[in-house]
C-alpha cells in the first residue's frame, strides 16, 4: 500500500470535514464524465450483442458488460476522491444493427478507449486503477477480434 501525499490527504479531509470548503476536481479528472458515459455505453453494447448470441459467447459478453459497469463505478470513485462528486451520467443509446456491425463498432471504440487509458497509467494517484482497466479492455479487444473472425 502506498503512502498518500499531503495534497491527497488534504482533499480527503475536506470531504470528511463539512465545515471546510469542498475542493474542486483536479484538471486531469475533467474528462471523466465522458469516460463514464463511454463505459456505460459499452455495457449496453455488450448486452445488446450478448442478446443476439448464445452459450459461452453470450456469457462472456455479459461478463464484459459487468466489467464495463465496474469501470464506470471506479471512474465515479476517482471523481469523488479528487474532490468532485459522482456525476449522474446516461449512456449513449446503442444503435440497432447486425452483430458484425456492432462488433466492429465496439472494437473501434475499444481501441480509442485503450489509447486514452494508456495515457492515464502514469498518473501517480490512480495509475494502478487505469492499468487494471486497460488490461481488461485489451482482453476484451482480443475476444472481439476472435469473435469477428467467426462471423460469416
Task: Kindly label every feature range from the protein language model.
Residues 1-152:
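Non-heme di-metal
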Amino acid at each position: 500500500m502506498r503512502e498518500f501525499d499531503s495534497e491527497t490527504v488534504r482533499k480527503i479531509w475536506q470531504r470528511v470535514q463539512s465545515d471546510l470548503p469542498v475542493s474542486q476536481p483536479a484538471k486531469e479528472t475533467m474528462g471523466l464524465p465522458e469516460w463514464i458515459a463511454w463505459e456505460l455505453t459499452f455495457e449496453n453494447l455488450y448486452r445488446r450483442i450478448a442478446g443476439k448470441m448464445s452459450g459461452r459467447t453470450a456469457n462472456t459478453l455479459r461478463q464484459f458488460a459487468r466489467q464495463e459497469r465496474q469501470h464506470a463505478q471506479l471512474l465515479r470513485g476517482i471523481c469523488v476522491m479528487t474532490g468532485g462528486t459522482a456525476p449522474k451520467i446516461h449512456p449513449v443509446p446503442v444503435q440497432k444493427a447486425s452483430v458484425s456491425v456492432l462488433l466492429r463498432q465496439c472494437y473501434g471504440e475499444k481501441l480509442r478507449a485503450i489509447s486514452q487509458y494508456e495515457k492515464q497509467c502514469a498518473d501517480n494517484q490512480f495509475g494502478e486503477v487505469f492499468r487494471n482497466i486497460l488490461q481488461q479492455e485489451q482482453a476484451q479487444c482480443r475476444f472481439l477480434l476472435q469473435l469477428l473472425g467467426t462471423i460469416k
